[in-house]
């Protein structure tokens, strides 16, 4: 063979390798999601915001059981099967075998998932003597607010592949509770290694999970980069890489979507919905939200400890005007905490009408005829249940001024807002909720129980025995009709006591590029990309 032919062959080989490399890079599929904010951290046990869950529990972690995407149906997760004892107090889970852990520069796993990981994940939240209990602030708002420290007597390892939960009483929604984000399973081996290294906080900042995506890089307020986890036990993701492009402004998110700089965006401006419907490059998905937007009154602070004052502030607000201006009619005025699409909804409850004169009369009866001043906290981010908190706050401020109540609007960065609100610094604070498991208990107990008042997710800090005497028995019985009746009564009590101004249930819109296939709107408000492809 001549030298020239050799060179020609080498050139062809080189060109072939280049072509293969280019082809591989073209085939590598990346999806960009224009997320609305930065996560508070990467351990879903410690936080309650959907922003954090989208970045942590959804892509990185798994739970013993999961919700089938797009539904509230509970399906096997890390547990492939389970049994419940006849008395409803013992749950036995049989773990999948061969489930791999992710790795990072600090940790290379030496074993698969086992029962030790499950026990550790719950013991950290329950046991104040666990060396990880106080790491990263040690705030387990969901676990504590749902009363789980008292409900769960023991989580014990039966063998390497079997775990048992022993409860102090039957709990109807317990299985669905275990599909929630706070119940994500963390690696005990990773935790032990980081504890020995003197860096336990890395477990919460540099996550190791068993989920479909693995964290590669996080730049606060800029982007989060993930890759598909090659060792994932489930169906492999159809995309190779996923980028969260952190974009707080909804108008900017929409502009990026139009330019194909991202392919999916959450929480569009209501004013942009009509344009999105006409955009031939965008598919606008929608469904009634399993959510509620509300304003909590801190009942530990005067004069909000007086039910007449709370009722007055509620009568004074024109909710229909808010639905038109803030939600652009993409929602409905709320009279109950749970949305009308949820079982147990009490449609017989009569909503507070817009009645400034009635509000003035109630203030007079409360000895506040001349009015008073109050702070009104407005969240700094868009949420599915509140597309424009600042505008809503301004409208409430104007309505209250008409009855002599002067409101000062207050806001903070989202993480700081939640931290201060949990500490009870506010008088009134805008909040909201998207259901986590399809059960009314997830609204009533998580947001307004006495346990939640103590542990932070009850921002009204309202602990009312007649209400508690309805929602607690409803949790304990497996008689569905009995639960419905108890929750209907609870809605009447809550309406009369007005611990919060219940404002709206929104319609949820999800604009996605036409190139995106397989994306499903989640009724629980999460954003799942493990079954999504980009053409």
Please give the residue ranges for each predicted region.
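Detector for C-terminal structural segments
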Residues: 30-31, 35, 55, 172, ...
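Surface-exposed binding/hinge segments that line
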Residues: 2, 94, 127, 131-191
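Aromatic- and charge-enriched surface segment that lines or borders ligand/interaction sites
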Residues: 80-131, 164, 303
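Ligand-site clamp/hinge motif
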Residues: 201-204, 229-275, 393
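Structural transition elements
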Residues: 213, 333-366, 383-391
